Swiss-Prot record:
Species of origin: Homo sapiens (Human)
Protein's name according to its UniProt entry: UDP-sugar transporter protein SLC35A5
GO MF term list: antiporter activity; pyrimidine nucleotide-sugar transmembrane transporter activity; transmembrane transporter activity
Catalytic activity: UMP(out) + UDP-alpha-D-glucuronate(in) = UMP(in) + UDP-alpha-D-glucuronate(out); UMP(out) + UDP-N-acetyl-alpha-D-glucosamine(in) = UMP(in) + UDP-N-acetyl-alpha-D-glucosamine(out); UDP-N-acetyl-alpha-D-galactosamine(in) + UMP(out) = UDP-N-acetyl-alpha-D-galactosamine(out) + UMP(in)
GO biological process: transmembrane transport
Places the protein is found: Golgi apparatus membrane
Basic and acidic residues bias locations: 408-417
A Pfam family hit: Nuc_sug_transp
PANTHER family: NUCLEOTIDE-SUGAR TRANSMEMBRANE TRANSPORTER (PTHR10231)
Amino acid sequence: MEKQCCSHPVICSLSTMYTFLLGAIFIALSSSRILLVKYSANEENKYDYLPTTVNVCSELVKLVFCVLVSFCVIKKDHQSRNLKYASWKEFSDFMKWSIPAFLYFLDNLIVFYVLSYLQPAMAVIFSNFSIITTALLFRIVLKRRLNWIQWASLLTLFLSIVALTAGTKTLQHNLAGRGFHHDAFFSPSNSCLLFRSECPRKDNCTAKEWTFPEAKWNTTARVFSHIRLGMGHVLIIVQCFISSMANIYNEKILKEGNQLTESIFIQNSKLYFFGILFNGLTLGLQRSNRDQIKNCGFFYGHSAFSVALIFVTAFQGLSVAFILKFLDNMFHVLMAQVTTVIITTVSVLVFDFRPSLEFFLEAPSVLLSIFIYNASKPQVPEYAPRQERIRDLSGNLWERSSGDGEELERLTKPKSDESDEDTF
């Protein structure tokens, strides 16, 4: 691998440039998304609009974009004949995309809940727990190996997050920060005003629908009474598991078998179709959602921030798809850590976030654990990455390594023996 890269420095430099560019785009979009979710809330840290409308619109934007590009790809490669007939196996492969779509659907909804309870800085710090869940699924689902240093760094990361949670007990009353006042695009109609006036306590029905009752934790357990777990902490742990499962399964079906050589835009079209389906069912089956859309309209409560959030969420999802297709999950998780630094800085400057001394002492431990994990990639033969070779429909031979961060590589020798094994 190294010799091939050295013999083609131009190709290597372009690959590195594209990798850094993709990572930078993902970081910018992820940071913008968190900030826009926070800015789109009202003064009470609730949402005047239905968050599901943001998700269904972003899925629609992604689907339209991918379908248009897919038609261009199919027309260019003269593959229109593949659209005429569909076997049972193709239908089964198509239905596989419903699983990550459903998980992404849950993940995108939980984000709105989390930021109703936590400061953006605290949310991104606690989201580092996804490194642990992703590493576990890496080992179980994708059969990727981790050495003992990496496992130790994951344990340190977990303990750092627990300590950080305990250190925020003095900020529980103001974790969500302050809300914002902004003008909506559409003024409510008479039927909408009547609908809102009929809500209990003259409150916004949407706001009541999208909040959890206050929960008190550790009221009986004295051993862990100093750890102040709130609803926001529980939700973000659940989100870490869901997002890790979604990304791991998505990477698996993006790269398995013949899917490896299929266009990413065709694959994403299947994923986003189910995304629209699940979000649309949520809007249609939930009575409160139907009543609000019927009386106030689909875009009631939306502002410039929520409209911008639709497009940022869409393009952030596309960037994740490119990372999972051409890189891997660990690159995605490690790039997300840069978002932690950005959001923490913005929270101090904008959201009136005042970190305590414990925060400054414990937050670097989280980032240090991440650095140790990334710097301790196994180099010994025991953990050598497994090589897979796949031939596409045009006869080109491709090679993919299962190691962290390895990219898909085309083998240029047309008559190379596929049974030969590379030595490392």
